Design a protein with these regions (language model features):
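Long, low-complexity intrinsically disordered segments that are proline/alanine-rich
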Residues: 16-28
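Gram-negative bacterial Sec-dependent N-terminal signal peptides
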Residues: 1-19
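N-terminal helix-rich structural modules
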Residues: 27-218
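Fold-level signature of zinc-dependent metallopeptidase catalytic domains
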Residues: 36-48, 53-65, 163-445, 449-467, ...
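Short linear, low-complexity motifs centered on an aromatic residue
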Residues: 2, 21, 84-87, 222, ...
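Long amphipathic alpha-helical segments
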Residues: 83-87, 217, 236-241, 477-482
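Zinc-dependent metallohydrolase catalytic domains
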Residues: 76-83, 357-367, 372-387, 400-577
Length: 577
């Protein structure tokens, strides 16, 4: 799974549910130059940099090879997204008129002729250079035969022997039809053979450059996987990757398959580890039991033995490609998705720090100038923002995970049904905020966030501003709905104060206790599996009140997201778009 700005916005772009800062810029029919320019402006251009100065000569050479490999992933993504994508891209590049250049620009941002944040609607004419362009991205993408219905494919799959059915529904196969119109399953290793052979060669060359054993092992096994179509061993090696160079490359996410959600799209993230930020995770891990033992909840619901923290690393991205550089930028991802790995080893979360920092600069800073009072704007602090994101992710592991219903063991997810994701995301936000305040008071964060009034002002004012960053996208996902609960509850408690003009502030005499009370409410709902209480809380608080709407109305010109230029990649290898 990937995240647009974890924990702030869930990655719903692929489902077409991310709301634009303004009304959708597309309308039926092709977009004009001015419309395409307006649409593109929703993505703030940023120069993405990562510090590679401490890498060995061999690792720098390996990154250059990996960036070269990632460019091939872009080609694969174009092909997987739509059968005519590559032909359309080639035709577009022949048109150097202002309209042609605007189309090229927006096409590349979306890796196709459909605007992702406008519900995957086309910005092109119905036909271009003899190529018919659907008004919306086909649900089947290019994973299934053009024109094949879901019903026909399901009937065919259901008639197959169990092993063949599993192959037809597997992540790494496509379905094609022969001359007689009969469906057949084709492995990625066959369907994309020329590109995968090139990828395998480049990964082996990168492996030869690095002297890091775990990186060498992963690259070698992933090169083998591209040719064998068996990714299991290389996924285990990716879980064990412990290298200054961090690489995710291959077919992973299934969002592009909107017909069944079976087929994995190729993506690449070439990054370098951030050891300092990753050490913060280790620090939190050492205090997990202490935090659990002090959660604002009845003692009977605390876990006397908190499990090990799931693997998590912080990186700075050097290059992104394919599904990893399309539309709204991924800020974190949780992989692999293969249930065999998850059952045995769990999954690994990768946090892209420089992507989140770029989003902070391009979206949260302008929002702060609109919704915080002038005297509070100086408190906006990336370190507080990012550390709270880390705390959010970590505190998903705290609190109740088992309930008792009628004498039988259950889980909050089962008990709370459709309300669970909203309650859990809000719980992680608030528990993360509580945990940072608790550790600040204990002096445990003196060397990172600091201690005392100035540090608390930064923490809470940054959190207040980030609330509006989430609500900027509308109440379309569990993170935003959870944030609406938090904002409205804290307003009702007087911990957040509305000044009637679309600006807000924190009452520092009330905020700590209000956060504790709200956290207790979320934790108790989960501990008791109280579905009715969760429903009532959502009915009361999942709304945009007039004072909050006034702030959101001022934010229409704030960019939705960023558009990175991979400056470090270009300096290392001549890469970059």
């Amino acid at each position: 799974m990937k995240y647009l700005l974890a924990p702030l916005v869930l990655a719903l772009a692929a489902a077409g549910t991310v709301t634009a800062a303004e009304a959708p810029a597309t309308k039926p029919g092709p977009a004009s130059v001015s419309e395409l320019t307006t649409m593109a402006k929703r993505f703030a251009p940023v120069e993405l940099r990562a510090d590679t100065s401490k890498l060995s000569k061999g690792d720098r050479a390996a990154i250059a090879k990996l960036v070269e490999a990632a460019k091939i992933v872009d080609t694969l993504q174009l092909r997987q997204r739509w059968a005519n994508n590559e032909a359309l891209w080639a035709a577009l590049q022949k048109d150097n008129s202002p309209l042609g250049k605007a189309r090229q620009d927006y096409f590349w941002l979306n890796k196709g002729p459909w605007s992702i944040i406008d519900g995957n609607r086309s910005f092109m004419p119905a036909e271009y250079a003899g190529i018919a362009i659907p008004a919306r991205k086909p649900d089947a993408a290019n994973f299934y035969p053009a024109g094949a219905t879901k019903e026909a494919l399901e009937a065919w799959m259901n008639a197959l022997p169990a092993k063949d059915k599993e192959a037809a529904q597997w992540y790494f196969t496509v379905i094609r039809s022969d001359k007689a119109g009969k469906f057949r399953t084709v492995k990625y290793s066959e369907e994309y053979k020329p590109e995968l052979e090139k990828l395998a060669k480049l990964l082996r060359e990168a492996a030869a450059h690095t002297d890091n054993a775990s990186l060498k092992k992963f690259l070698t096994l992933r090169a083998d996987a591209f040719l064998s179509n068996d990714y299991l061993a290389s996924d285990f090696a990716w879980m064990d990757l412990d290298s200054p160079v961090d690489i995710t490359i291959g077919p992973y996410e299934t969002y592009n398959d909107e017909l069944f959600g079976y087929k994995a799209a190729f993506e690449a993230y070439v990054s370098v580890r951030d050891p300092e930020e990753t050490r913060k995770l280790d620090f939190f891990g050492k205090h997990m039991q202490e935090l659990e033992d002090n959660l604002p909840i009845d003692k009977q619901y605390r876990n006397p033995k908190v499990g090990a923290m799931a693997p998590m690393v912080v990186v700075n991205q050097v290059y992104g490609a394919g599904d990893g550089n399309m539309g709204v930028q991924t800020a974190a991802y949780n992989l692999p998705n293969d249930e065999r790995i998850i059952r045995e080893r769990g999954s690994k979360r990768v946090m892209l720090k420089n992507i989140q920092e770029a989003k902070f600069e391009s979206t949260l800073k302008p929002i702060t100038k609109l919704v915080l009072r002038p005297q509070d704007q100086k408190d906006l602090d990336f370190n507080s923002f990012f550390t709270h994101i880390l705390a959010h992710e970590i505190t998903h592991g705290l609190g109740p995970h088992v309930t008792k219903q009628g004498g039988k063991e259950s889980t909050p997810r089962q008990d709370l049904k459709e309300t669970y994701s909203t309650i859990e995301e809000a719980k992680a936000d608030v528990t993360g905020l509580w945990a940072l305040a608790y550790m600040m008071d204990k002096g445990q964060l003196k060397d990172t966030l600091g201690q005392g009034e100035a540090a608390e002002r930064k923490l809470y004012n940054t959190f207040l501003a980030s609330c509006f960053r989430t609500l900027h996208f509308g109440l379309t996902d569990s993170h935003a709905r959870g944030m609406a609960i938090q904002v409205n509850y804290l307003l009702d408690k007087g911990a957040f104060v509305s000044h009637g003009d679309g600006t807000f502030s924190v009452d520092f005499k009330k905020i700590k206790q209000a956060v504790i009370d709200l956290d207790r409410e979320f934790l108790t709902i989960e501990a008791t599996g109280d579905y009715a209480r969760a429903k009532a809380m959502m009915a009361r608080y999942v709304v945009i009140r007039p004072d909050v709407q006034k702030a959101l109305d001022k934010m229409k010109a704030v960019p939705n997201d960023i558009r990175p230029a991979f400056v470090t990649a270009a300096s290392l290898s001549g890469a970059g778009k």
